[in-house]
Structure formats: C-alpha cells, structure tokens
C-alpha cells in the first residue's frame, strides 16, 4: 500500500485489473483493446514474460510451499540446508531441499521444491511428500506439526540462473526485468537501480553485464 501511494504521489497512473495483450514498438495494448503509448516499456511479468516478448529464454519452474498452524518459538530464524543451492541451480531434474522460515504469526513456512516442464498449478503429491520427508529428516519434530495450507507457484528461470535486466535484443524501447527465479522480491530494489541506470545512461554501481538479456542470445548460439 505504501509503495502504491508513493508511485501515485510521484505522478504515475495505476491501471489495475487489466491484462496486457501485446507489447508493441511504442506502447502496449490491453485486454479492452485500449492502446497505451509509451517511450519505453518494462516487461516484469515473471515466468509469463515470454508470452509478451518472444525469443527470451525464460522457463517456468514450479514450486510447492506449506504453512503450518501456529507454534510460537518452534523455530526462531530461517534454516536452510547446504544443498539448497544445488537444488536451486539444477537445470533438469526435479529437486527438493529443506528450507523453513518462521513467520511473525508463529506459523512455519516449509519448502522447497523445483520442477521444470510442469504447467499445472495442482499440488503434486509425490513431490510434496519428498519435500516434507526431506524437512523431517532435518527436523524430526516437524512431523508432529499440523499444516493448514499447501500451494504452488511458478518461478521464472534462465539457463545460467541469472535474471534478465536490460534492453531486449530485438526492441530497444523494451526493457526486461525477469528471470529472478525465487529472488524477485529480494532483489527488486537492485533490479530497479540497474534498470534506471541503463535507461538514463548513467554509470551503475552494480555491474550490469552479467544481467543483460543479450548474453542469453549469445549462450544459445554458442
């Protein structure tokens, strides 16, 4: 809510409840066929980015999460197994890794799983069972907790595991901000900084070369 207030107070107009049908050279067309003209467009639609920008190598990577009932003090800080990075960087096989985060409510958020090539958002019972068995291996007492909800989501993944931040290869008026996988919110401020620096032709304190979309085209043709 505070972010929304800040955006509006700085002169932006928010259009909510509308879907972008297409990105064109000088703007976007939304689902009521209204055309919104713009000097540049930022495609920051996560794993759905390829639907609006053809040719970018971003794939959906499905994940499961589970949240428990309230157990204040059960875990006081996030715990992650060392193999989490290996799971996160796997590019082919389904994988699970132990990750638990206590919430302010006293609930425990438990993950994680990763699956490529899955379009359905339905709960995958076998992969969920693997994920929870992994968690209980690390913390046996988790088996005594009650869960209240399980859900899935899709991460936006790139071949080299780095996000695409910068101008599209085929449209200089289009900028991409996608492919962050599970770190989109965590790295959002840095992503915004890199984008703004490129748009206003300002030297960035953050190296931009590793994130330029052009590098993925180079990888695919290497």
Place the predicted regions along the sequence by residue.
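Active-site-proximal alpha-helical segments within enzyme catalytic domains
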Residues: 5-6, 40, 44-45, 190-198
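Glycine-rich, N-terminal phosphate-binding loop of Rossmann-like dinucleotide-binding domains
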Residues: 45-46, 178
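Short beta-strand to alpha-helix junction loop
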Residues: 1-6, 122-127, 186
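C-terminal catalytic lobe of FAD-dependent flavoproteins
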Residues: 126-130, 136-222
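Core beta-strand elements of the Rossmann-like FAD/NAD(P) dinucleotide-binding domain
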Residues: 31-40
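Helical element adjacent to the flavin cofactor pocket in flavoenzyme catalytic cores
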Residues: 1-25
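Active-site substrate-recognition segment that forms the wall
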Residues: 40, 47-150, 154-169
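Helix-loop-beta segment of a Rossmann-like dinucleotide-binding subdomain
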Residues: 1-10, 113-116, 172, 178-180
């Amino acid at each position: 809510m505070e972010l929304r207030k800040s955006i509006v107070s700085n002169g932006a107009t928010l259009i909510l409840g509308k879907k972008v049908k297409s990105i064109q050279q000088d703007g976007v067309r939304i689902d009521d066929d209204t055309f919104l003209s713009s000097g540049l467009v930022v495609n920051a639609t996560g794993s759905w980015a390829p639907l609006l920008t053809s040719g970018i190598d971003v794939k959906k990577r499905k994940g499961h999460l589970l949240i428990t009932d309230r157990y204040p003090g059960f875990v006081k800080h996030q715990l992650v197994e060392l193999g989490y990075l290996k799971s996160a960087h796997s590019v082919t096989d389904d994988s699970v890794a132990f990750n638990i985060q206590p919430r302010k409510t006293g609930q425990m958020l438990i993950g994680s799983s990763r699956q490529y090539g899955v379009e359905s958002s339905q709960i995958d019972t076998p992969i969920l069972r693997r994920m929870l068995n992994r968690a209980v291996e690390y913390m046996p007492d988790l088996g005594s907790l009650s869960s209240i909800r399980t859900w899935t989501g899709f991460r936006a993944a790139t071949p080299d595991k780095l996000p695409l931040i910068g101008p599209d290869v085929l449209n200089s008026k289009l900028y991409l901000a996608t492919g962050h996988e599970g770190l989109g919110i965590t790295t959002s401020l840095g992503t915004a900084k890199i984008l703004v620096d490129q748009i206003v032709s300002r030297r960035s304190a953050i190296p931009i070369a590793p994130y330029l979309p052009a590098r993925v085209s180079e990888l695919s043709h290497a």
